[in-house]
Each structure stands twice: as structure tokens, then as C-alpha cells.
Amino acid sequence: MLVRHVLWLLAGLAPFAAAAPEKFRFERPLMGTRFSVICYADDRETAAAAAGAAFLVAEGVNEIASDYLPESELSRLSSRPLGEPVPLSPLLFDLLAHARALAEATGGAFDPTLGPLSKLWRETRERRRLPEPDRLEAARAAVGWRHFTLDPGARTITLRRENMAFDLGGVAKGYAADLMLESLADDGVPRSLIAAGGDIRLGEAPPGRDGWQVALRTFDSDRPDEILTLANAAVSTSGDLHQSVEIDGVTHSHILDPGTGLGLTRRIAASVVAASAKLSDPLATAACVLGDDGRELIADLPGVRAVKLRTPRDQPTPPAK
């Protein structure tokens, strides 16, 4: 009799059991690309509110750290006199400190001070003509990640080289994606994925699954090179995929070689799996610059889970870690 009553009680409660979370998708243009949020939530209203708040977080990062916006906090740094400590917002200080640490870790393969060269290369891509040697040398002379100092106690930056300018395009999207995921989780939507161009930040796995399936596509866009199952991680892919330009019969990537000041001429793509997108984003760029010689260096950095390099002719190379 007791069993019968228990079964009856459970049957009566069944209609009130929580419904399975639904999948929702939201998109918005940001930082020169398209940001997407894919998430699982109990209803569209909850998902839309959480995604909207996350997009606002990314917009805030862009307003501070964009080198395309002349009035951004980052852009205004280039007009400050040498040797003068400049107070920074908490976000920009944290972002620059992170970028500098990665510049040191990669031996300058990722360099946040490439602003003068980035601006010159944008002109070069439009004109489809290499820059004049004197302009290239002037831009190179203004670059160098060692030539600015940060004071954590005062939260200031001091520039040590004339005509310095920052370009955080290789880290800002990943940094924003990390903050977006935090925002979504804080709003009760931890089962989320953020895609920002070649950067993907993954939160908790979808309901009933081990992780999110991520297809890595590089030179053969019709079929994936590899399909990964990931949760609470990030993966970024960078390389000579969609933004190359041909000048005088030579194909140049949009990724700058800090050594030459010009776009890379070897065709290469790199995917980095890491604990956060603020790691995977810049390290994918650095992996392209360093090539196979730097793969082990990057794979050994804290938080890095895998480094994958590919060329148009090669089969996928095994991960270094």
C-alpha cells in the first residue's frame, strides 16, 4: 500500500517537474566581426536578457580598448607625453598587463605596441603596394613591448618611446568573450558559448552532453580539419584564411610579423585550445608568427591545452600537448 501511495504521489508531481532548458541564439556586430551567443535557458526572456547584458559588456570593452575609435581610452594614450604616468581604468590596465605578459612569454611574437605598423599595413592593404622604406622604418622604430611600464599600485602606464601606439586587436575579442561568459553565468545562464570571429569561448556543457562540439576549419572550408568536444575552455583559430592580400605577386597575411613590420608571407593557420579566450586569442596569433619552431613554447605556457598548426598542403599536425 505504501508503494502504491508513493507511486501515485510521484505521478502527481510529474507535471510540475522542471522543463528541459531550451537552446537560444543571439547575434550582434562588434569589434569588426560578428559576436554570437548560443545558450541554454528556461525561456527566451531569460536568455535574451542575459545575452543582452553580455553584449553590453563586450561593447564596454570595445569603447575602452579599440584602436579604431579615436576617442577610446586606448587611442588617447598615443598622444600622452613620454615619461608621464597616465592613470588607467581598471579594465584597460588589466588588459595591457595581460598583453605585456604574453608579449614577454612569446618573445614579442605577440606585441600590443604594433599600432604604428598596424595602421601602416591597413593603408598597404588598401593600396596594394608595399610601404616606402622610410615610412616602414619610422613605424618600426615606434614599436616595442618593452618600452612601456605599468605601475600596479598607482594603476598607471608610462610610455618610454616616441610615437607609440597600441593595437589590442589580437587579444580584445578574447578578453571580451571571457567577460561575456562571466556575465551570462552571473545571470543564471552558464551553459553558454560565445563566438567572436575566430575565437570561441565555451561555458558549461549543453544539457545531457559532455561538451560543445567545435569544428576547426582552416584552409579547406568545406570540411572540418577536426571536431573537438569542449566545455569550460576556449579555442581560437588565426592565420592566412580570409584576409590575405597579394602585392607584387606575393601573398601577405593580415597578421603582422613584428620582425619585418609586414604581413606574414608563409601560409599558416594555428588553433590554440586554452583555459580562457584571453589566452587562446593572442597565442593563436603568436603561433602563426613563430611557426613550428614556437609550438612547444606556446604549448608549455600555463593554461594552454593544445596547439595545432596547419598549412594548405599539410595534413593536420599532431598537437604539441
Predicted regions and their residues:
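Mature catalytic core of soluble alpha/beta enzymes
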Residues: 2-321
